[in-house]
Regions:
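N-terminal glycine-rich, Lys/His-bearing helix-loop that initiates the first secondary-structure elements
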Residues: 1-16, 391-394, 422-423
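Conserved PLP-enzyme active-site core in the AAT-like
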Residues: 12, 37, 55-274
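Conserved N-terminal alpha-helix of the aminotransferase class I/II PLP-enzyme fold
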Residues: 15-59
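Short glycine-rich or small-residue beta-strand-to-loop segments that form or flank ligand, phosphate
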Residues: 51-53, 133-136, 316-321
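Conserved C-terminal alpha-helix-loop-beta "cap" of PLP-dependent enzymes
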Residues: 77, 266-415
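Short, compositionally biased
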Residues: 99, 415-423
Length: 423
């Protein structure tokens, strides 16, 4: 006589596995039994203290930011995080909730990639004196940073390095590992569900062995700040079941899949496609060199009953996994190679200039706001996360003044309205 209301007898067929926090089922944020044992198994697989999230990397990012803030305050400093401009919206929302300052890193290359090098990071640390650094690796397009050299810079200047590794849980199982914790990061989150055999919402929070033990002791407490009090046992069960797969068959399956994906990429290049270099398990096509927008290629794929992870005017992103069959990859090859190449499209994304800050993120997000047409927003202060596509660096951040440059970028990506601070 306890929750859930379906009593294990619902219409979908899996309700019997959907438990709640009854005797013997343990509690995610006060784990002493089977959940604690399962998380320890995951910790052994990743070589560091690892904790489950049933709310994706969003909960992990919020928790990492809490640790970064608490670490700064413990040293008598106001939290100020130096972050790559391609940070996920959950990082920006965390800034509003936790009231920390952000200094943005734009990188020194195309603004869509936010490629940050060690020398850029060191210069920024010296100039802005942050209490921590937060970077995304890999990004949505599959670009990889040199985490090892970036981590060395952070250690040299005694600032913590947190990595949003949402797209790279599988990197731990490469030879050699490219996982951020193995390369020197202090904190890291993985969206297990993105690249591993885990249900949507399943994620990991990893803490390095070198991180202050105080934060390891408090991590579950911090996670509770943002989490539902009813975490999904179905998602936890999938994280637990994945442990055995990761410990036994996954490395070999991943190796075979990487070889198949590499072969497919080579075939596509021979056909004339431009494939971005980066992580091995992501196929990112820069479509305009082939004479099409990403939207046009995506529509053709969907006519072949193949649904891409992402597409826009410039790119299409495909995310195979070891659980795609060889027939899946062959069907993808046949569909893409059935498209005839056309003259290159020369229109490129508009250049994004750095925006002027009028107030901090917290002030902007919690201000009274109104919605305006983008074309009428020049000079207004943005009050919401406006970007409509994951790969792009945000054209304007809450608290920044909307410029002609940011308006041009928003229009390019089809953003028609924007919320601004009410005057």
């Amino acid at each position: 006589m306890h929750m859930p209301g379906h009593k294990g007898a619902g219409i979908l067929g899996f309700e019997g596995m959907d438990l709640t926090e009854i005797y013997g089922a343990d509690e995610l944020f006060a784990a002493e039994g089977i959940i604690k044992e399962s998380e320890q198994n995951a910790s052994n697989l990743f070589g560091c203290p690892t904790y489950y999230s049933t709310q994706g990397s969003t909960l992990c990012i919020q928790t990492m930011c809490t640790i970064l803030c608490q670490d700064a305050k413990s040293k008598g400093k106001k939290p100020k995080i130096l972050a790559g401009r391609n940070a996920h919206r959950s990082f920006i929302h965390a800034a509003a909730l936790l009231d920390f300052d952000i200094e943005w890193l734009y990188g020194n290359s195309d603004y869509l990639s936010c490629k940050i090098h060690a020398e850029d990071l060191e210069k920024a640390i010296i100039e802005s004196h942050p209490t921590a650094v937060y970077l995304t690796n890999p990004d949505y397009l599959g670009n990889l940073l040199d985490i090892q050299s970036l981590a060395s810079v952070c250690k040299k200047h005694n600032v913590l390095l947190a990595i949003d590794n949402a797209h790279g849980a599988y990197l731990r199982f490469l030879e050699p590992s490219l996982h951020p914790i193995d390369l020197g990061a202090d904190l890291c989150c993985d969206s297990a569900h993105k690249t591993l055999p885990v249900l949507t919402g399943g994620a990991y929070l990893h803490l390095s062995d070198s991180l202050n033990q105080v934060w390891k002791n408090d991590v579950k407490h911090f996670m509770e700040y943002f989490s539902s009090t009813s975490p999904s046992y179905l998602i936890m069960a999938s994280l637990d079941a994945a442990n055995e797969v990761l410990d036994t068959t996954f490395r070999n399956s991943l190796f075979e899949c990487i070889q198949s994906v590499a072969s497919l990429k080579n075939t596509l290049v021979q056909h004339g496609y431009t494939i971005l270099s980066g992580e091995p398990m992501k196929i990112t096509i820069s479509t305009k060199e082939f004479g099409y927008t990403g939207n046009e290629i995506a529509n053709h794929l969907m006519e072949c009953d193949i649904y891409p992870e992402f597409y826009d005017s410039d790119y299409i992103v495909l995310m195979p996994s070891p659980y795609n069959t060889k027939d899946d990859l062959k069907r993808l090859e046949t569909c893409l190679c059935g498209i005839e190449r056309k003259p290159i499209l020369i229109n490129k994304p508009p250049k994004l200039e750095q925006s002027k800050k009028a107030m901090n993120v917290r002030q902007a997000l919690f201000s009274s706001s109104i919605t305006l047409d983008v074309s009428k927003s020049l000079g207004q202060v943005c009050s919401s996360v406006t970007v409509s596509c994951p790969p792009a660096i945000l054209p304007v951040i809450p608290g920044e003044v909307i410029s002609e440059s940011s308006i041009e970028v928003m229009k390019y990506y089809g953003i028609e309205t924007v919320r601004v601070v009410k005057e």
